[in-house]
């Protein structure tokens, strides 16, 4: 598969940017990703009250050995991710210069060394809040528009999922402020980006930081954090031609209490689709306090609540192209199809009836959505000039629900013409209740080894994840008319209960050794212990056969690579990295009859990163070779056979120029 993408845009107000991205990829095996059917409406933006985009996070000094360096490192730590102080619209915001591809931002998605994206021996993209505003990005799914070689989609049963480098779904890990919560197809939800500082994307295996999964890459959503300085307030609003609207408010800065800084954000997005009776309503509110106890110690606490209420589009029935009364569309779908929901049959040419393009076949009482609550707290302690300790504890509580007619399919055996009750419908209801607790602690040591600067990070992480599912087993079905469906209501429901518990503990080490001022070795290794237990009860409360069961996994993953600045603004890099994930499904739905094994994935990657002397032009190039072994495929329902391996090879090129 070869794809060529061209993207150009302009930066409003502060400067103009001409952004070109080029992607050419060859994938030996890739998975298709369902795309959102909602039309991408062009919003009419009302200018913000105050525009004060956050500056990129600052990288601490490589080897602070003097009091001056120590002070600089503390300052960078306190102001990490700080928004610029309010300035006139004609004046550039204060803080470090953001490069065209934003590679000067510190990221946590690929490494815990505290280095900028440019210094990583991997392809790391950072989409800043400013970039999101310039490109009109409103939701986390839209972030794919700003990333090279990344596809995003809102499939109704698994919203906010991504595909990159030939992998998709649960092989792409999703993190929230560096915290994994579980397989993305089970935990992913659409989210407004107004409260985010940046979105970090690493491409290729990344289990070193992201843990189980991350075969194709990982995406980290990073919230805005407080800054030290005058209070800055900002607000925005927009509306579109479908009467959808979006509004938000943010505020942050120093309080009257010495050393106490705050950040608060709230937003709401009502996004209406072009299919009858479809919409997505997203609400986010978040806040954080930072308190500088002294020059060496900072403590903080954060809370975030997210809610989405949705009426998703579940598809339009395919109909026989030659059936009596059908008004076919052209250039939309073509080919042969048979209704496998009803046992198949002889494949026939199909089309979509032109009169059903906006028809909703879902039940009237359909709903989908989620309520999510995050509580996080931590500290950062500079123990000495060269040793620092940071830690965060977190709690996450989520309730998700689906209550829909998920299948609408033409049945030739009932009526082979428009007007008959020929559309077969089938229901599914599902509820999730998830509770996650955990801790991540990093010890960073900067030192000098034989005259060479060295940075070492040891990370200890532990979490307890309870994931409960209540799922309808009746799959109630009925028939409706193709052109005038009587949508009706959901009908009877009888639920089975599934309880999954996952305890995870990991120990990882990372190191960067600068052999010279221009050449550095970067590597890391992660040891992980994962204990899974599952129990399942049928709709009558009886324990199902082969349950409960448990399994322990002990994957070891890592990365080794180098970076070499061969000339000013020209850096070469290469890496070898590995990842692990379940062989047949995500870990929340493994059954005792499925192979309880892990796949192993590896990547070879090499590339070059270019940055002009004036930091107005930037380009990256990478070539990769990914292989995922021990892959199984479904057969006869819940039986699985070894399929061998998946492989993906390709190249990526990104370039951007900012005009004066």
Annotate each predicted stretch with a short phrase.
Residues 86-125, 129, 135, 141-180, ...:
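Extracytoplasmic beta-strand/coil segments of soluble accessory domains associated
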Residues 124, 132, 143-144, 199-204, ...:
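Non-catalytic regulatory/gating segments with a bias toward low-complexity or hydrophobic composition
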Residues 194-197, 208-287, 293-299, 373, ...:
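Outer-membrane beta-barrel translocator/receptor signature
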Residues 292-294, 434, 453-465, 498-626, ...:
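Structural signature of Gram-negative outer-membrane beta-barrels, strongest in the C-terminal barrel
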Residues 375-398, 425-537:
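Face-selective signature of the C-terminal outer-membrane beta-barrel domain
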